[in-house]
Amino acid sequence: MILIIYAHPYPHYSHANKRMLEQARTLEGVEIRSLYQLYPDFNIDIAAEQEALSRADLIVWQHPMQWYSIPPLLKLWIDKVFSHGWAYGHGGTALHGKHLLWAVTTGGGESHFEIGAHPGFDVLSQPLQATAIYCGLNWLPPFAMHCTFICDDETLEGQARHYKQRLLEWQEAHHG
């Protein structure tokens, strides 16, 4: 099962993430958990989230890039749900062998994330990748949709279909 952990503080304003979710919903075996809808007060149901994760083979963290990082509720979710003794540490093997895909949208162009004037995309992903590895997850190459503020509808739809294709390819490779 593919579990999409969707974290967008302003989902009604996101054309890119909305299209990505619409495409993902057309696949079988996909569950979407919208953190800002489930936990507007940031009071996370840790047991429910761990139960959802236990059913997943692929975990997707989908969100907009915010100040070169993840939204605050996703950070809190990781801190609370990936707990010692469950996700890491003594006896913490619940996530071992599962896969993690970072699916992120950005307002800036791809060149904005090259090494030089701005941090490279590989640099920005390091904390998430390190978290994945520390918890025994298999880190997958990220999916990034850039220039979402200025993309036309056709481009957004094409990128959303590419996202769906990434998920489908993973399903076919791991579940035939």
From Swiss-Prot:
FMN binds at H8, S14, H15, A16, N17, M65, Q66, W67, Y68, T105, T106, G107, G108. Keywords: Cell inner membrane, Cell membrane, Flavoprotein, FMN, Membrane, NAD, Oxidoreductase. Its EC number is 1.6.5.2. This is Glutathione-regulated potassium-efflux system ancillary protein KefF. Belongs to the NAD(P)H dehydrogenase (quinone) family. KefF subfamily. It is found in: Cell inner membrane. Its main location: membrane. The keyword Flavoprotein applies. It is a peripheral membrane protein. Transmembrane segments: none annotated. The keyword Repressor does not apply. HAMAP family: K_H_efflux_KefF (MF_01414). GO terms for molecular function: electron transfer activity; FMN binding; NADH:ubiquinone reductase (non-electrogenic) activity; NADPH dehydrogenase (quinone) activity. InterPro entries: Flavodoxin_fold, Flavoprotein-like_sf, K_H_efflux_KefF, KefG/KefF. It holds the Pfam family Flavodoxin_2. GO terms for biological process: positive regulation of potassium ion transmembrane transport; potassium ion transport. GO terms for cellular component: plasma membrane. It catalyses: a quinone + NADH + H(+) = a quinol + NAD(+); a quinone + NADPH + H(+) = a quinol + NADP(+). Its cofactor is FMN. It comes from Escherichia coli O1:K1 / APEC. Regulatory subunit of a potassium efflux system that confers protection against electrophiles. Required for full activity of KefC. Shows redox enzymatic activity, but this enzymatic activity is not required for activation of KefC.
